[in-house]
Amino acid sequence: MSDISRDEVAHLAKLSRLALSEEELKQFAAQIDEIVDSVSAVGKVEAEGVEPMSHPHSVHAPMREDVVVRTLTAEQALDQAPAADDDRFMVPQILGGGDE
């Protein structure tokens, strides 16, 4: 058992900018603990001699010819933007200043 604490979940919630109740903190601590235990069980699997793979089945990625097509210039793309500065789109700030 990995024993994920309520305080560790509170720290993760703060980093994720989530407001969690005390009940949710305890509930998520138990759930995360269970997930960590399940994932750690993978490390106990006997895998000696098993070749590493990314998929259990072979995956074929079909290739296509690269075709040059007409695209917008930077000026054309920025022309429809509500705000632009120095060839870049300007968007509203969504995160704090990082002083936490």
From Swiss-Prot:
**Main enzyme class:** ligase
Q: What is the reaction catalyzed?
A: L-glutamyl-tRNA(Gln) + L-glutamine + ATP + H2O = L-glutaminyl-tRNA(Gln) + L-glutamate + ADP + phosphate + H(+); L-aspartyl-tRNA(Asn) + L-glutamine + ATP + H2O = L-asparaginyl-tRNA(Asn) + L-glutamate + ADP + phosphate + 2 H(+)
Q: Which GO terms describe its biological process?
A: glutaminyl-tRNAGln biosynthesis via transamidation; regulation of translational fidelity; translation
Q: Name one GO molecular function term.
A: glutaminyl-tRNA synthase (glutamine-hydrolyzing) activity
Q: According to the UniProt entry, what is the EC number of this protein?
A: 6.3.5.-
Query: Has keyword Phosphoprotein?
Result: no
| Alphabetically ordered keywords of this record | ATP-binding, Ligase, Nucleotide-binding, Protein biosynthesis
Q: Which InterPro entries match?
A: Asp/Glu-ADT_sf_sub_c, GatC
Belongs to which family? Belongs to the GatC family.
Sorted alphabetically, which NCBIfam families does this protein's record hold? gatC (TIGR00135)
What role is this protein assigned? Allows the formation of correctly charged Asn-tRNA(Asn) or Gln-tRNA(Gln) through the transamidation of misacylated Asp-tRNA(Asn) or Glu-tRNA(Gln) in organisms which lack either or both of asparaginyl-tRNA or glutaminyl-tRNA synthetases. The reaction takes place in the presence of glutamine and ATP through an activated phospho-Asp-tRNA(Asn) or phospho-Glu-tRNA(Gln).
Q: How does it assemble?
A: Heterotrimer of A, B and C subunits.
PANTHER family to which the protein is assigned, alphabetical: GLUTAMYL-TRNA(GLN) AMIDOTRANSFERASE SUBUNIT C, MITOCHONDRIAL
What name has this protein been given in UniProt? Aspartyl/glutamyl-tRNA(Asn/Gln) amidotransferase subunit C
Q: Which organism is it from?
A: Corynebacterium aurimucosum (strain ATCC 700975 / DSM 44827 / CIP 107346 / CN-1)
Ranked from the top, the taxonomy reads: Bacteria, Bacillati, Actinomycetota, Actinomycetes, Mycobacteriales
